[in-house]
């Protein structure tokens, strides 16, 4: 489930195989096994190319599934030439393997070759599947949805009189999600034999072994108990894959599942799961290869593909080269995850009843040092957020202080009812949602958590907070552990960001109150978080230097609570207020503040404008995404000037 961000490395030469070579391979009418094996070898080269060029993606799970996807699209999927609305259906429920699927679609001519240059770019191929892309049949989000979606598709197809086979690829870590098991029984009862689920059983979830998190036990027996026909094969042996599907041809009235034993990172020796040393975390779940890793990986993949082409009588494999765009990271940045990592251990040292729970994101959430220092107080719950939250509820009821972690997009949504239930009991749990907000933009909307404030902000006895700088991480966590009596949600931006201001010396944490980042008299701007406030700070600089307008920029780290007296004092005599959200405008902090300002009854009336996300988040580089959604520096300058102009012209709005 992780989303690792890479630091600066130099540009380097990348190699890909043009789609014309795949067409040459398919036109040669080779035996199906030979063609599929060669096609998959090319798809791995192009998957590596896309992820390296994009600077992020999921190599390990793409590589483990490519032999399966290649066989399905070359030999099982019917009527592909009739378009995505008329052919058999394939989609990945795990979603991380999107680059692998794109490489297959490009190789078949179902996506333009130039799309490979635009993985995780605005207007390009999204980091996770999105139905706006041709032949992508379902979006992904929290894991475990795939079989349920397939059932709905099967019933709709039957009602329309257009039955189609439906192939669903899942991960093995995904089987820890309860929805997967909920979805099985009714499929068997309804005899949905057109559904075939393939489990990419690569034995590794995110960064560690599945058996160390939630051992699947006798998986085949469990699946059979739900009424499914179960087969098993080597997921990298196209002959074995073919044999399994031919055996399934005669089974019409029973849903089918194929357990495909695979290797995460298959095709590159040092990326393959079995190469992990005992105790290590798997290094190639997310992120992108370094220059050296790319050179070594591409050499292995090219050697294999060239050998397969030559052995098939196709001659030399044609390739093309391109340069990986330079990615330059600022040298001095605020890293809130690293700060949280350190702050958590400090609090654990002081509070022996503090217990940490994780939902398969130990590295991304900064939990490795805690897990190493306090293994008895660390609970890895796997990809099972609802179970994790209810476990935290039980811990809290018996006197422990649970701190539960996941990405904000998952922690706020999937276990929302469990969080509400826990808070209703009056116990204390600290929830920590990382990867919060619009950035990073590369993973796409399924991971861009821009609705968590709205989802959790109305829960009684739950305080929401977001730090802007590393020092504030320490201060807020200490307050939430030591002082806050009720439950809380700490929202953490994961991207590193250069922040042009510091946490004020001697600043005391007061719920509902913030602090002035820079002072001014013409406009009050209130926001939170590192990149949002930093962009506003730079916008304020431009306003002052270019237009003579000064801005009072305020950091309010409390997302669902404001002290009215403090707010009135913070606004002062200024009657122009701009509210900012790293979140949907609807349901964000700005909505709460706009209502609070209206209730202050200021005279003369204050002009209030809001800026934030107003539509489904776009996928792209961070700069592209910020500009698209109007949250980059230039857009904020325009927004700030606009609200000042409206107020000056007498156009007063409290909900602009």
Regions found by a protein language model. Name each.
Residues 173-180, 234-242, 410-411, 467-474, ...:
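Active-site glycine- and acidic-residue-rich loops that bind
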Residues 2-167, 306-491, 496-497, 506-508, ...:
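Thiamine diphosphate
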């Amino acid at each position: 489930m992780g989303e690792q961000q890479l630091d600066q490395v130099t540009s380097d030469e990348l190699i890909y195989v043009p789609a014309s070579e795949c067409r040459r391979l398919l036109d040669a009418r080779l035996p199906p096994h030979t063609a599929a094996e060669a096609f998959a070898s090319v798809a791995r080269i192009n998957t590596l190319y896309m992820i390296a060029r994009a600077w992020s993606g999921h190599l390990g799970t793409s590589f483990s599934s490519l032999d399966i996807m290649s066989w399905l699209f070359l030999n099982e999927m019917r009527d592909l030439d009739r378009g995505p609305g008329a052919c058999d259906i394939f989609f990945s429920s795990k979603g991380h393997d999107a680059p692998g699927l794109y490489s297959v679609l490009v190789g078949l001519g179902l996506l333009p070759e130039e799309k490979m240059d635009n993985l995780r770019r605005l207007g390009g191929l999204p980091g996770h599947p999105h139905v706006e892309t041709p032949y992508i049949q379902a979006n992904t989000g929290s894991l475990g949805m795939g079989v349920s979606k397939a059932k709905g598709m099967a019933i709709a197809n039957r009602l329309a009189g257009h039955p189609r086979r439906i192939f669903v690829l899942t991960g093995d870590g995904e089987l820890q999600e309860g929805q997967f098991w909920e979805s099985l029984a009714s499929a068997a009862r309804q005899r949905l034999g057109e559904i075939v689920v393939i489990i990419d059983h690569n034995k590794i979830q995110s960064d560690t072994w599945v058996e160390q998190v939630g051992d699947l036990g006798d998986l085949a027996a469990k699946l059979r108990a739900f009424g499914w026909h179960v087969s098993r094969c080597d997921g990298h042996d196209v002959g074995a894959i073919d044999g399994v599907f031919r055996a399934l041809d005669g089974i019409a009235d029973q849903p089918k599942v194929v357990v495909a034993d695979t290797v995460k990172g298959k095709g590159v020796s040092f990326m393959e799961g079995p190469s992990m040393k005992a105790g290590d975390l798997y290094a190639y779940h997310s992120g992108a290869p370094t220059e050296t890793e790319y050179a070594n990986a591409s050499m292995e993949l090219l050697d294999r593909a060239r050998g397969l082409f030559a052995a098939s009588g196709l001659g030399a494999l044609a390739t093309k080269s391109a340069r990986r765009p330079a990615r330059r990271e600022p040298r001095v940045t605020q890293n809130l995850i690293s700060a949280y990592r350190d702050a958590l251990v400090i609090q654990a040292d002081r509070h022996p009843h503090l217990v940490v729970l994780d939902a398969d994101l130990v590295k991304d959430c900064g939990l490795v040092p805690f897990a190493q220092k306090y293994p008895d107080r660390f609970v890895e719950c796997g990809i099972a957020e609802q179970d994790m939250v209810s476990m935290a509820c039980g811990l809290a009821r018996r006197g422990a202080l649970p701190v539960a972690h996941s990405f904000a997009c998952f922690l706020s949504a999937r276990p929302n009812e469990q969080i509400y239930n826990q808070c209703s009991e009056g116990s204390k749990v600290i929830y920590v949602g990382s990867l919060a907000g619009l950035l990073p933009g590369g993973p796409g909307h399924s991971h861009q958590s821009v609705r968590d404030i709205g989802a959790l902000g109305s829960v009684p006895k739950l305080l929401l907070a977001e730090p802007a700088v590393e020092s504030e991480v320490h201060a807020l966590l200490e307050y939430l552990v030591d002082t806050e009596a009720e439950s809380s949600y700490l929202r953490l931006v994961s991207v590193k960001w250069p922040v042009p201001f510091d946490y004020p010396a001697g600043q005391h944490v007061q719920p509902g109150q913030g602090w002035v980042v820079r002072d001014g008299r013409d406009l009050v701007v209130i926001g939170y978080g590192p990149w949002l406030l930093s962009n506003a700070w730079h916008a304020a600089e431009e306003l002052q230097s270019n237009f003579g307008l000064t801005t009072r920029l305020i950091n309010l780290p409390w997302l669902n609570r404001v002290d009215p007296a403090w707010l009135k004092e913070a606004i002062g005599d200024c009657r122009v207020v701009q509210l900012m959200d790293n979140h949907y405008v609807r349901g964000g902090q700005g909505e709460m503040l706009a209502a609070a300002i209206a209730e202050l009854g200021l005279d003369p009336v204050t002009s209030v404008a809001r800026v934030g996300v107003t539509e489904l988040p776009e996928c792209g580089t961070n700069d592209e995404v910020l500009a698209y959604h109007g949250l980059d520096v230039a857009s904020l300058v325009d927004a700030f000037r606009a609200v000042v102009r409206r107020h000056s012209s007498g156009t007063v709005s409290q909900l602009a």
